[in-house]
A protein has these predicted regions:
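Core nucleotide-handling region used for phosphoryl-transfer chemistry
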Residues: 2-457
Length: 457
């Protein structure tokens, strides 16, 4: 048996086995205490003892069989022991909650409770071994997999579509995308998972995290459909009959779907039924040079006057008279640029290069809030083993960066999403620090069953 990360796992929603040996008293509640998991605080009852726990992050969902076995459902009828009552709703989602003014960010389940479930329900003996700090979402045994937790996504109802037009001619699809040329954006890690990732002497960039639709625009090598003449040419030049011809071409995508991957079909309009990515592509495409990929956020309104993200206008106004104008009805803000050569080797623009390239070429990057050494942001914090803890506590509440404030870029009063942190070390990675106000807004939307474009685009 083994604890594993599935192929679909999102790094921010993995469960983690932790060894909790110390607690802090809750500042405002005599019957609670606080455990620390990386950069997170988790409120617990006074009776909880030191030992191994499984940490489940906020907005992950726990397997219903585990919740039932451990009697954690609020609905007693769902629990193994119907006389016991927990606090999880039917969806099994882990929520952040302020308890007497102190945020509790996640849920800790005794490791023994999880192993007892596995032994009793799956008939698998969990060996005694050092499992501290293992991250996982799946338990694998006897060539079988059992999911433990995953990111909570609102289920989308699907409805059968009747074919009223009779038999339709099928369209042959040709996928032109080379996975060595086009790359989706990496998952941005929650900094509270890795508070040690930034050290005092690191050169860092802080930019505003804005709430819109992720997008990718690329001018990279693609496959070209072969004509009869191309195939004959292949034979005459000693190549395989079906060997693809490569050309530079334009691609654009949402966070997880390439909209024009195929030559023949019309681009996929996606979540909105309207191709906002195609509209944004018209803005970015003229600036792309061979090998370049630009990653950006689209904010404001859709062509039919809906918010791209509910209530987040970013200074835009709804379109009128069938006009959809950049910087008036929607905005595109660049946050990452790469260059990929013909061999598939990618160069990552530094955070400062992204800012300068955009300004030199007439595009607008995300707002840069700070650029410099981490230690110089708050020079009064002593550089010792507690530096990271104090640094992130200070940053999480820094009004200069609009933390726990309304968005400075929106006319509507909506919570600022937070900050993106990058380290200038030529590695393709970034971290994010969200405001608690924004996290609470996300939770309320999940409770209301409101779909998120980033999960469905």
């Amino acid at each position: 048996m083994v604890w594993e990360k599935s192929k679909e796992a999102n790094i921010n929603y993995l469960s983690k086995i932790v060894n909790i040996q110390q607690f802090e008293p809750h500042p405002n509640a005599d019957k609670m205490k606080i455990a620390h998991v990386d950069g997170y605080n988790v409120c617990m009852g006074l009776d909880e003892q030191p030992g191994l726990y499984v940490y489940f992050p906020v907005n992950s969902t726990i397997n219903p069989n585990i919740l039932s076995y451990c009697n954690l459902y609020r609905d007693c009828e769902k629990n193994k022991d119907a006389t016991k009552k927990g606090f999880f709703e039917d969806n099994g989602r882990v929520t952040a909650i302020k308890l007497r003014g102190t945020p509790s960010e996640g849920f800790l389940l005794p490791y023994e409770a999880l192993t007892s479930f596995i032994q009793d329900s799956l008939n698998v003996v969990v060996p005694e071994e050092d499992v501290t700090n293992i991250e996982f979402d799946t338990f694998t045994y006897n060539n079988k997999s059992f999911w433990i937790s995953k990111k909570y996504i609102i289920p989308v109802k699907s409805y059968p579509v009747s074919n009223q037009s009779g038999r339709k001619r099928s369209v042959k699809r040709f996928n032109r995308v080379l996975d060595t040329q086009f790359r989706f954006h990496y998952n941005t890690t929650l900094i509270k998972k890795e508070p040690w990732a930034i050290q005092p002497n690191d050169l860092i960039s802080l930019t505003s995290k804005i709430h819109g639709a992720s997008s990718i625009f690329a001018y990279v090598l693609c496959r070209k459909p072969l004509t009869i003449l191309d195939r004959i040419s292949n034979i005459l030049t000693g190549k395989k009959w079906s060997e693809n011809k490569l050309i530079y071409d334009y691609l654009y995508a949402s966070r997880s779907v390439i909209k024009n991957a195929n030559y023949n079909p019309n681009p996929n309009p996606g979540y909105y039924g309207i191709d906002i990515w195609g509209e944004a592509n018209k803005v970015i495409k003229p600036f792309l040079t061979k090998g370049m990929t630009i990653y950006a956020e689209i904010v404001g309104y859709t062509p039919d006057g809906k918010y791209i993200q509910k209530n987040y206008d970013y200074g835009c106004v709804p379109p009128e008279n069938n006009e959809y104008v950049s910087e008036k009805n929607f905005k595109v803000r660049v946050y990452r640029i790469t260059y990929t050569n013909i061999d598939g080797i990618t160069h990552e623009f530094s955070a400062r290069e992204v800012q300068q390239w955009c300004k030199n070429n007439g595009l607008i990057p995300v707002t840069e809030l700070y650029y410099g050494f981490a230690k110089d942001l708050y020079p009064d914090i002593p550089i010792n083993e507690d530096w990271a803890t104090k640094f992130w506590e200070r940053l999480a509440n820094d009004k200069n960066f609009y933390m726990e404030c309304n968005s400075p870029e929106c006319n509507n009063k909506v919570p600022h999403e937070g900050i993106v942190i990058k380290k200038e070390d030529m590695h393709a990675r970034a971290w994010k620090l969200k405001t608690y106000a924004f996290l609470n807004k996300e939770q309320l939307e999940l409770d209301a069953g409101e779909l998120n474009i980033e999960d469905n685009a």
